[in-house]
């Protein structure tokens, strides 16, 4: 049976770093309050001339190098983003051009913070169907450009960055993506959204969020989704080496671990260094886990994310 094997992982964070203390110069907050409430210590912010496609391309190049494959071996590029360079064309086609992947077709998907898990599921199905062999899956966001920097309830939470994974068809029965599950509930679309849109008012707008309710949904739905994928594969918490949750808030990660009785040392946490990077969150956390020596070959990991829509999903993978 064909499996989608992770060949390489790459990441990119802009050079500019904004600490919590720097935010206190423009809004009423404190480093202590932000760290206690979110676990965030700093965030990376893109330069004015830096585009989402630039960051995505940088992360992709590192992933390709890590995988040890040539750019022309890529059959498909999927970019998960809420902040593309332009309304159209897709960010993925711009990345394809910048990379020079002449043999690939490319498109974007938008599921906000769940975007990377959605993209992994789509890529996995393309590979399993035999339509493609090797896929570049990228999550990239410039969230700083859709923030109200005077709204302390949202501007302290987000950062910019990109992460990428190279997936390739494999017949190794014990490695690769084992299964995914995806969910949506549009009745909650007004809990997390932007104040603008192409058809709505012709401007990008800024992030608006009912933080308390989103927080509650995140704990409930991430927990249920993790239990669902474990049940589907006849696995228990003890069978999983690592849990890589969307890096939105340290308290969400802690409370999901507590609710499911997951030993906290199994939780991958990188939010302190880059804040909530939306669709880039999962691959950035994976890159951190790999580069820090935690994530090793043959480890079993659960990737889980939730975002606006609401959308949420989980991916079970053996590295």
From Swiss-Prot:
What the entry lists under NCBIfam families is as follows: fabH, PRK09352.1
In the record, biological process GO terms are:
fatty acid biosynthetic process; secondary metabolite biosynthetic process
Name the catalytic site residues. 113, 246, 276
According to the lineage, what is the superkingdom?
Bacteria
GO cellular component terms, A-Z: cytoplasm
Question: Which pathway does UniProt place it in?
Answer: Lipid metabolism; fatty acid biosynthesis
Entry EC no(s) = 2.3.1.180
Return the InterPro entries for the record.
ACP_syn_III_C (IPR013747), ACP_syn_III_N (IPR013751), FabH (IPR004655), Thiolase-like (IPR016039)
What is this protein's record name? Beta-ketoacyl-[acyl-carrier-protein] synthase III
What residue spans carry the region label ACP-binding? 247-251
What broad class describes the main subcellular location of this protein?
cytoplasm
Q: Is Transferase one of the keywords UniProt gives this record?
A: yes
Task: Tell me what reaction this enzyme catalyses.
Answer: malonyl-[ACP] + acetyl-CoA + H(+) = 3-oxobutanoyl-[ACP] + CO2 + CoA
What does this gene product do? Catalyzes the condensation reaction of fatty acid synthesis by the addition to an acyl acceptor of two carbons from malonyl-ACP. Catalyzes the first condensation reaction which initiates fatty acid synthesis and may therefore play a role in governing the total rate of fatty acid production. Possesses both acetoacetyl-ACP synthase and acetyl transacylase activities. Its substrate specificity determines the biosynthesis of branched-chain and/or straight-chain of fatty acids.
Q: Which EC main class describes this enzyme?
A: transferase
Instruction: Note the subunit structure.
Output: Homodimer.
- Where is the protein found, in the record's own terms? Cytoplasm
Starting at the broadest rank, the lineage of the source organism is:
Bacteria, Pseudomonadati, Pseudomonadota, Alphaproteobacteria, Rickettsiales
Q: Which molecular function term from Gene Ontology is one that the record holds? A: 3-oxoacyl-[acyl-carrier-protein] synthase activity
* SUPFAM superfamilies referenced in this protein's UniProt entry, alphabetically: Thiolase-like (SSF53901)
Describe the family membership recorded for this protein in Swiss-Prot or TrEMBL.
Belongs to the thiolase-like superfamily. FabH family.
The UniProt keyword set, sorted, is: Acyltransferase, Cytoplasm, Fatty acid biosynthesis, Fatty acid metabolism, Lipid biosynthesis, Lipid metabolism, Multifunctional enzyme, Transferase
Against CDD domains, the record matches this protein to: KAS_III
Q: What is known of its domains?
A: The last Arg residue of the ACP-binding site is essential for the weak association between ACP/AcpP and FabH.
């Amino acid at each position: 049976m064909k499996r989608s094997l992770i060949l390489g992982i790459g990441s990119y964070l802009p050079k500019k770093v904004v600490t919590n203390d720097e935010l206190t110069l423009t809004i009423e907050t404190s480093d202590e309050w932000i760290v206690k409430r979110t676990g965030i210590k700093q965030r990376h912010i893109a330069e004015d001339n830096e585009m989402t496609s630039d960051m995505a391309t940088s992360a992709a190049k590192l992933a390709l190098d890590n995988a040890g494959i040539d750019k022309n071996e890529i059959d498909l590029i999927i970019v998960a983003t809420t902040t593309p360079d332009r309304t159209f064309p897709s960010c993925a086609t711009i990345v394809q051009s910048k990379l020079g992947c002449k043999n690939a077709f490319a498109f974007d998907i938008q599921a906000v913070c769940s975007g990377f898990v959605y993209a992994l599921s789509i890529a996995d199905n393309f590979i399993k169907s035999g339509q493609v062999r090797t896929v570049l899956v990228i999550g990239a966001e410039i969230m700083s450009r859709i923030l109200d920097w005077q709204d302390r309830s949202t501007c302290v939470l987000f950062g910019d960055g990109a992460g990428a994974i190279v997936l390739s068809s494999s017949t190794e029965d014990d490695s690769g993506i084992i299964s995914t599950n995806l969910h949506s509930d549009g009745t909650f679309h007004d809990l997390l959204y932007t104040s603008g849109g192409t058809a709505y008012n012709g401007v990008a707008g800024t992030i608006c969020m009912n933080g308390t309710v989103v927080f509650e949904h995140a704990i409930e739905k991430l927990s249920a989704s993790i239990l669902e994928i474990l049940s589907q594969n006849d696995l228990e918490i003890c069978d999983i080496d690592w849990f890589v949750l969307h890096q939105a808030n340290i308290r969400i990660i802690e409370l999901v671990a507590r609710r499911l009785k997951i030993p906290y040392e199994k939780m991958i946490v990188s939010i302190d260094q880059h804040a909530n990077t939306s669709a880039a969150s999962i691959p950035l956390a994976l890159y951190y886990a790999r580069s820090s020596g935690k994530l090793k070959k043959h480890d079993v990991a659960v990737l889980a994310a939730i975002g606006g829509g609401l959308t949420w999903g989980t991916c079970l993978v053996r590295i």
